[in-house]
């Protein structure tokens, strides 16, 4: 998908391929802006979906697993503070996310006729009802 105009065609290809599920990576800002439309279309196709950002689950997507972006933004703010106070950028370590969350939308699971196994529910950071 190159942009928002390609969303419908991309989902039509997924439907024609008779996909069993859909995984949407968190690296495309255009998809984040289209999340309401994307989730509605995916659910209309009755495709279980896994997203990289919680906001998709809050809009009705089935599940998300990914970093907590609020933590990432806080860390970026700390870097900016250090840089504006004169820290040499070469002295700052490269950091990776350390907190990840699994969020499950139980309403969507029920609508899709899916039962989420108890061990998966126990590992969830949050559920949407």
Spans of features found by a protein language model:
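Short hydrophobic alpha-helices and adjacent helix-cap/hinge residues
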Residues: 1-129
């Amino acid at each position: 998908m190159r942009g928002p105009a390609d969303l419908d065609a991309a989902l039509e290809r997924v439907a024609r391929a008779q996909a069993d599920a859909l995984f949407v990576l968190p690296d495309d800002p255009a998809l984040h802006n289209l999340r309401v439309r994307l989730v509605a279309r995916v659910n209309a196709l009755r495709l279980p979906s896994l997203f990289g950002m919680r906001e998709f689950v809050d809009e009705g997507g089935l599940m998300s697993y990914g970093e907590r972006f609020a933590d990432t933004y806080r860390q970026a703010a700390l870097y900016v503070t250090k840089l504006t106070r004169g820290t040499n950028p070469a002295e700052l370590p490269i950091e990776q996310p350390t907190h990840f969350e699994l969020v499950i939308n139980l309403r969507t699971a029920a609508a899709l006729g899916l039962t989420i196994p108890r061990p998966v529910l126990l590992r969830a950071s949050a559920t949407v009802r």
